[in-house]
Amino acid sequence: MLDGIRYIINRDSNEVWENLIKQTTLASAVETDGVGLHTAVPVHVRLTPAPPDTGYVFRRTDLGGFEIPATVESVAHCGYATTLMRTGVMLSTVEHLLSALRGLGVDNVYIDVDNLEIPILDGSAEVFAEMIEKAGIVSQPLARRALLVREKVAFEQGNRRISVEPGDHYQIDCLIDFPHPMIGVQQFSIDLNNGAFSREIAAARTFGFTDEIEALRRANLIRGGSLDNAIVLTPDGMLNKTGLRFRDEFVRHKILDIIGDLALLGMPILGKVVAERSGHIMHAGLMSKLLRVRSAWDIVDVPETHVQSPRSNVQSLVSAT
């Protein structure tokens, strides 16, 4: 859990806990099988309910249940996927699963996996979202916490940038720019409320370019990649015969990645994320910088009315968490 100041809404009211959004977990366990995008190894993943304040915890069942918490501190590599590590034990390509959990508002889950990479499935978060919906989501007795942004924090590398700024709820605005006839400049904005993730983001697939494939495979990457789990772009089109799921599927997938990577903060964001030509490395850079700028955020209990004005509802300082 992040070190920060916890606020509570209407602390002296007898109805305080009824007016706060509760933490959630799964109602039952759910599982699936697949292969790793980069390793091509078969992998089984099982999601199980977890107690309040657990967050997302990966457990390597092939290593005796060794736990790797899904936190910023666990990030080891973030080139073509986000890889976590704890005391030398790694787990790769976690972002799509974390995106589904955060996008659907699940706070606490144990994720059991029997190999070193989360399965790529169809290249999106749709299968994970369907698993979560099948399992069901239940409320827990403790209030949900969120990272309330108070000051803008930005991270930049050349013409790539990503920032987070104050906002009344979790919003993401993303722009991408690829010199390809099917992409070009695309921009999409989303407010992560009222089922928007399932409707607008979950089905957007990862994508790559044919002129990069051989170099990636020589680097022992994308060995499990295929037309079944990625959009593969030629210089003037795409190899997939099934077409796009959205006209702007590419930028939507970038938002999917942002949600998954920023889930490593351990709680939803009350603020607006703005990304231009971003990627996993940029996301990790923003999170690290944000946590260092202690004046830029607070940890709050989330009121049911947070979409109107969370900052105006914060009344009482109680304790450090």
Q: Where in the sequence are the language-model features?
A:
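C-terminal regulatory domains involved in ligand/effector binding and gene-expression control
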Residues: 2-107, 112-321
